[in-house]
Amino acid sequence: MRQPASEGLAAEMRRLAEASSDASRALSRAQPRAKDEALRAAADAIGRRAKEILAASAEDVAAARAAGQSAAYLDRLALDPKRLDGIAAALREVAALPDPVGEVTATWRRPNGLSVKKVRIPLGVVLMVYEARPNVTVDAAALCVKSGNAAILRPGSDALRSSLALAAAFAEGLAAAGLPAASAQVVPTSDREATFELLQLDDLIDLAIPRGGPSLIRAVAERSRVPVVKHYQGVCHLFLDQSAPLQQAIDLALNGKVQRPAVCNALECLLVHREAAGRLLPAVGRALVDAGVELRSCPTSTTILARAGVPAVTAAPDDYGKEFSDLILAVRVVHDLDGALDHIARYGSLHTEAILTRDLASARRFEREVTASAVMVNASTRFNDGGELGLGAEIGISTTKLHAFGPMGLAELTTQKFVVEGDGQVRS
């Protein structure tokens, strides 16, 4: 049980959330051109403030290095001129996207003459809790403001200096467009209790989105009174069905595992139909090993790979269901499609699941029976991404079925209200 925060910290977090709540009301009334102007002006401000942002980033990286963080962690944390240019470009891309607020998604007329329509509206105040990725500070702020929401941004403590510097540039953009400074606020302390105080403020904050590792997401979900949409780990599978073509099997396995092994839509487990294992596994396994992948395989697949001279280690029980985020891949031979479906139901994380098959019935059954935010048929798991699916920028990939499932773009940062128009009708 956590100790209560100091009265000063609790009061400070309430004031911050109250300012966000006030800003959200102003944003809900803001015209699209004002929001777009704010994002473009923020992009320009990042360019002007590049020197101080990079200096803040260097301080973050130096402190994290002194604390013994890994090279991969430091790479995610660091900003450089090229990455800053990418952050600014992303702001301009969001500004160019259609504004979802006010969109009429359905309309109909009742027999009594009432006209009914559903209209997109902002959620209100969104609390974003994430790890040491300073680019998320700007990405989340941009998507929230564009969709009419105020953002409270809680980065990992290692990214606090750079996030505050980026937020200062973003605030310039808000000011240029006449929008409230509290439309996007970074929590200005590394005290973890600040997060837990904010998570109690369900009277002011409408949604919490944790984005990071299992411990972060579990802590937020367990301690929040605010509704939570989890962006959880991606334990993504590719099932090679009996009819899977060999070259496509190699291509999908390599793309899913090797291109960016640490991202949430990377492949973590390869399932192979037993009737196709002897035909597919030697070549697929060789291609993966040649690309630097360590294979952790079941006894059947280990035997097949060994006969082909492909090195593999015997998988431990907990290798299935694990997000390796590295050049490591679990491999298992399953009896048939039923075996693949059972394995995915047991070990999947509701993120992304894929099948490679030439059998239409198998494809349709896989689509129908697999529960995941995205189901891929004859395509890489890496396509579960807002940009790749044509949705534009995303705040993350939700593995929560409510309120959004899959990539969360602008539309997923809204809800809908009913608007009913009549001419004096009363209910009988």
Swiss-Prot record:
One GO CC term, this protein: cytoplasm
Q: For this chain's UniProt record, which GO biological process terms are given?
A: L-proline biosynthetic process
Q: Does the keyword NADP apply?
A: yes
Its EC number is 1.2.1.41
Q: Which residues form a coiled coil?
A: none
Is Oxidoreductase one of the keywords? yes
The entry's localization annotation reads: Cytoplasm
Pathway as given in its UniProt record: Amino-acid biosynthesis; L-proline biosynthesis; L-glutamate 5-semialdehyde from L-glutamate: step 2/2
Which regions span the lipid bilayer?
A: none
Keyword terms, alphabetized: Amino-acid biosynthesis, Cytoplasm, NADP, Oxidoreductase, Proline biosynthesis
Q: Which domain of life is it from?
A: Bacteria
Main location as per UniProt: cytoplasm
- Give any GO molecular function from the UniProt entry: NADP binding
Family under the similarity heading: Belongs to the gamma-glutamyl phosphate reductase family.
Instruction: Explain the purpose of this protein.
Output: Catalyzes the NADPH-dependent reduction of L-glutamate 5-phosphate into L-glutamate 5-semialdehyde and phosphate. The product spontaneously undergoes cyclization to form 1-pyrroline-5-carboxylate.
The protein's name in its UniProt record: Gamma-glutamyl phosphate reductase
Organism of this sequence: Anaeromyxobacter sp. (strain Fw109-5)
